[in-house]
Amino acid sequence: MKVKILKKKKIAIVSIYDLGNFGNRLQNVAVYKLLKNLNYEPEVIPVDIWSKKKYITRPIKNFFNIFKIQIGSARRLSFLDFNKNIKISKYKLLLKSNKEVVNHSLSDVYDYFIVGSDQVWNPEFAGFGFYFLDFVKDNRKKIAFSASIGVTDISKEFANKMQLNLKKFNAVSVREKQANDLITSLTGRDDITTLVDPTMMIEAEEWNELARKPKQYNGENFILNYFLGEQSEERRKIINDFAKKKGYMVINILDKDDPFYASGPAEFLWLEKNAKLICTDSFHSSVFGILFNTPFLVFDREDTSKNMSSRLDNLLDIFGLKDRKFIGKELTENRLDIDYSKAHERLAFEKKRGVDFLINAIGGVEE
């Protein structure tokens, strides 16, 4: 089979745009890099979800004003600096209170529209139609790339919304088997593909090039403590007791009182690679543990009313790492031992599947 990349296509990436979330920024960069590596011309369209109701599109004059970023925040500046790794569209999606027709059609600017990755179809975020690409004209391709729902329970109203919109997509891939089963059931489609997160389709060496040692690091061995949900005192004590026993310091990267709170995605990558152990309830923190061969332990999230564990359970299952789930009341030495050989064999296979999906969805393969 002869593979040929066609004339460069201009592609819009629509995803959650959070200048404060490591995983979100890293998946955004991953999708962008994958498309660039395939010789396409991607641009990320920022989404302003802070205004109301209906959206319009308009050129950006001052990128900083969109997100009301406080320039004095070292952490925000670190995130902004990392954003230099992607090309931002001069247009943004902006919610508006009235239902006027959009004043600029993005369908006249881009050839393809890709939504994903991340939890773009989580009911908490996807109430906004742009994550279903409902602003895109029918003569443009709509592609979902490793999209996630993030929860296992959705309302009937939201299920109907998914059913209506996803039937119109030209190609759909999701990040979890549970999402695949749900969408297949809702739409009757038999072509839904389950892929790993795009961050796993980028080589570790390429992530290494983006990593940066935090200025605060003093050379001590450390445990990276990264919890998106609430962390109980009991869990903190388990981790701190083990760190004390080993002579490690604990870096609480999301604690505003921790010096490492100023870290951006580049510093996060370095910490993930160099930690002696990662303790987390985060999907992307676990992903980079696998990519960097760093020992990690997954804790169930304690403070959520909806089931948020499907993504992590699916990840551990695919890569044969179910033993990375922490159960118990004590951390022991053997949790630092991990064999990634089989996981990386599977990783190579999954990377190829992801790239093949993009090429076929966009139309870059010629017999």
Question: For each of these PLM feature ranges, what is it?
Answer:
Residues M1-E367:
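Active-site anion-handling motifs in enzyme catalytic cores
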